[in-house]
Amino acid sequence: MNTKEINRVLQDTFNKELTEGKKRHIVFWYDEAGEFIEDIDELNLEGVRIWKLTPHNMFATKLEVEKNDVNSNFLIYANMAKPSAREDWLLDVYKYSQEFATDKMTVMMRELGITNDAALRDVFKKYTKFFKSKEREALFKSFSVPEYTEEQIDLVVLASLCKCNIVNLDEVIKALFREQLKETNKYWENIRKFGNEETFWNLVEKTYGYNLQDKSINSLLIFFLLTNVSETLSGDIPKTWQPYISAIPMNAIVFMNQFMNHSADEVIYNELANTVEKQVKVTEHLQSKEIKDYITSDTFCCFDTNIITYITKQLMNAIHDYTSYIEIIAARRKLHWFSVFRNEYEALYQAIQLFQQIYEMGNAITESQPFDLFKAYESKYHNIDTAYRKFYVAFDQIEDKDGFRALRDKVENIYTNVYINDLAIKWSDALEGEQEEYWPIAGLESQHTFYRSFVQPFVNKEERVFVIISDALRYEVAKELSNMLNVERKASTDIVAMQGVLPSYTDLGMATLLPYKSITFNENAEVYVNDYKASSTENRATILSKHYKDSTAIQYKDLAAMNRQQFRDVFSGKKVSYIYHNVIDARGDHAATEHEVFHAVEQTLKDIRSLVDQLINTVSASNIVITADHGFIYNRDTLQASDKVKKDFLNTDIEKRRFIISSESNSIEGTMNFSMDYVLGEGSGKYVKVPRGANRFAVQGTGANYVHGGAMLQEIVVPVIKFKNDRSKSSKNDVRKVEVKLTSLTRKITNSITYLEFFQTEKIEGKKTPLRLKVYFTDEEGNRISNENIIIADSQSSKPEDRTFKEKFVLKSMTYDKTKKYYLVLEDEEEAVENIYEKVAFPIDIAITNDFGF
């Protein structure tokens, strides 16, 4: 009964017919507890005077009612006990009036529909202080409760005091933990002042098994964390931890799983866990454990730091158990702290990839002919460059690099002095032995025939084609880009390698991508195509349109600034469109920013993927070709003087770190000499001299760590991605996630701990992409009743055993109704709307136990 309801009842009382010769209604209301003292002024009774009686105005009240106003109806409200007859100055008035009686608990119970349960009256009385506040009362009433029991009332009070959205002890505990890092835990203060501490601790003990004598929110936090640790930590549990481990751990384990893995609580949980980790000296206790003892433990971050340190030391000590390390990292991917240490794990993974590939090829490049070495780089060696690049992308983002500096040095040493050095020797020897000043290599697709090979076929068929040229997009980067594009939309994507021009620098590389009859140098060594200077976008557009009138050229940065209509207008009526993108070379070609080149690669991958989407969605592009003018070499460490080649003559047209163009045909020690007739025409009289391997010429100017222009495979293996959007009804190019099936035969749960097996039905390849699932149990209403497991189905293995997942489910300790439905839910983590991948009915028949159910 709220104020409105009290007003109605009193109004009905005053509206009743007068009997026994009475001329008016006088109603006394004694509210000794003051439960309605805030409500009395809000009453609006028609034709009734409300008079407040106090111990000090009894005579004045008697005078007012019997002398001054003998006609009005009176509600006489008294915030005091009803006086005895001897002390009651208004006894004569009381005898011909009537009394209105109610109390807060009666009103509350009546409003909540509790009319015949006297036992619950004492429960409500326990919270008299709580219900004195209108705000708290309103919060209590705001919760929808199907049936009130003593425990339910306790929980609603706790939920109200902790500002929870639902009535659930788990939510109350979470709210208390969220406040624990603050100077004062306001929710715990609320419980102490307006709730009942003893009731709270009794509920916690009953639900989670917490029974420490020294009860506090901090010790409760330790209890939850250590109980959770005990579920995954192998071997003996430290004696000092044992009092904090629940005898009925299921509910605590499920609580912890939901608390630590909820995105809204992740930061709070991490701070709490780090505080407790120090309090209970987890790191010290782990010294007596092996890595295998806590490979799936994720309560504290020291599990991850120990594992990261372990793998790092193993790699530093050249322990070649690479498969084991990758399995450990794969296991950690599903666990809580992985996101915090993502960069550390990624750096380890890429270091493993680099070391493993070099180790498996016997720490040496196989001697081969130029053609075979080119093809070997295209098929496998480029992966080492990718691992090196990705190692640094991750390493640069690690906040505390101290633990990784030695590994970084080893990565640098192995990459530079084993891989690059050996590749440089074998490749240079092969070129000198077979090519004898002749470029290009026979049998390979050549960059200087790019237009004829990859653009002219579309012109011949009068099909529209877009050519994206990204400066310094080397082959290994394009390979990653091709893989990304392949699984991002319905399309066919293929990548091939061209042999780039020599020298592999921008002016010449860009020129050979155009349709040309002649390429020449002027007296300033500037490149001309068909008598047009080829360095400007405007001139390139002219060269293109002279060959085929419906052609254009534009810079990516100009496109990026356009609105949708402007974007359409640029390509309106055009059949051949060249789009120039420059991020990698722009960053790498300057000493101040060359160390950022790998991060420029990341930006390039984003830019081109976005551009492809825009071309398809805005101008309905179908045919897109992506290529580059050249690749690049990059080493993080400063070059030694021995890596630089001195020039012995001055008669040069162009001098750069990786090449010299000259009219001199003689060779310089430490270099290779090639005629440029292949691109400039017979009798050009121009020669390019490049240092053997990855060495640089000693010249003044830009940075020396990022270079291009030479003949190393990283520079001259130029990618061509052939992308064709597919709008057909055929499913040939459909992108789809692999399937995961529940393979366990059982469809009934009889134990609080249950293991279920799942199977990735096919390996990742082609258009089949990974599937990431959250898997858990719920009741009919969708409330979670178990921990949550993560399944990452991304195996590329052909072996079924490598695509099998065995997951452990811990169910809450509660009463399960055999007649009700419970479900195993498989939720696609990456889907925002239709995220339920599968829902499997599971009857649950578990006897309530006080242990793990064994």
Swiss-Prot record:
* GO BP terms: defense response to virus
**What residue ranges carry the coiled-coil annotation?**
none
- Pfam families linked: PglZ
**Does Cell division appear among the keywords?**
no
Q: Which UniProt keywords apply?
A: Antiviral defense
Induction info reads: Part of the pglZ-brxL operon.
The free-text function statement in the UniProt record for this protein reads:
BREX systems (bacteriophage exclusion) provide immunity against bacteriophage. A core protein of a type 1 BREX system. This system allows phage adsorption but prevents phage DNA replication, without degradation of the phage DNA. Methylation of bacterial DNA by PglX probably guides self/non-self discrimination. When the brxA-brxB-brxC-pglX and pglZ-brxL operons are transformed into a susceptible B.subtilis strain (BEST7003) they confer resistance to bacteriophages SPbeta, SP16, Zeta, phi3T and SP02 and partial protection to phages SP01 and SP82G (these include lytic and temperate phage).
Tell me its family: Belongs to the alkaline phosphatase superfamily.
This chain's protein is named Alkaline phosphatase-like protein PglZ
Question: What are the top taxonomic ranks of the organism?
Answer: Bacteria, Bacillati, Bacillota, Bacilli, Bacillales
**Gene that encodes it:** pglZ
